[in-house]
Amino acid sequence: ILRTAERLCQEVPEFEVFFAVDGEELAQPLRDEGFEVLLTDPDLPSGTDRIAQANRILGRKTVINVQADEPMVERSHVLALAAALDKENAAMATLAVAFAHEEDFLDPNQVKVVLDKEGYALYFSRAPIPHPRDAGEEHWSGKDPFAYKHLGMYAYESSFLDSYSQCEQGVLERVERLEQLRALERGYRIGVSIVAKATIGVDLPEDLENLSFR
């Protein structure tokens, strides 16, 4: 989490950086390094609910959510999120990147997103979507993608956060375990920016060991 904090300050020094955490174990190391920390309810169902609770204290008009497992986030990713939120009527925004390999496209741990012609999300799924009806039709196309890999960073309008946190989890969100589906189920538009490369996330201790920080 400290690596991510330092990285954000390095990449986007003009942005305010706050940390919304669910306990003192995470909060104190950040405070010790001079970062501003907000303690939130540990039983919230999603990261977006956590951001909503934190922003009720902060009162910011727009919020960008970078999770602590993204210590290699780049300036371009943050600015792309801001640009996606600027799309007309977008209440929420996120990032996507083309899949490099078919096995990644078929992996349920790598979330797929399909877009409309204007760059808004139609649906997110762990399943490989869309599914070809006819035998022999391409299921995956690396050259001309019809689905992208979702990158789990978000931007929000504050009014949307207030509404989102008051909504119960929908069926799709519970089935897929994807918090952004609550927004789509409620009719909100999610702007998506396609970026050139994915971030390098850290899910396991060995992932951190394999990273080279600059």
Where are these regions (language model features)?
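Short phosphate-binding loop-to-helix
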Residues: 12, 18, 22-80
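Conserved alpha/beta core of the MobA/IspD/sugar-nucleotide pyrophosphorylase nucleotidyltransferase superfamily
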Residues: 138-214
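Conserved core of the sugar-phosphate nucleotidyltransferase
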Residues: 75-169
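Short, well-formed alpha-helical segments that are part of the catalytic scaffolds
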Residues: 1-9
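A general structural signal for well-ordered alpha-helical segments in protein cores
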Residues: 1, 27, 47-51, 78, ...
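Hydrophobic/aromatic residues located in beta-strands of well-ordered beta-sheets
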Residues: 17-19, 63, 93, 121, ...
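Short, high-confidence coil segments that cap the C-terminus of an alpha-helix
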Residues: 14, 60, 88-91, 188
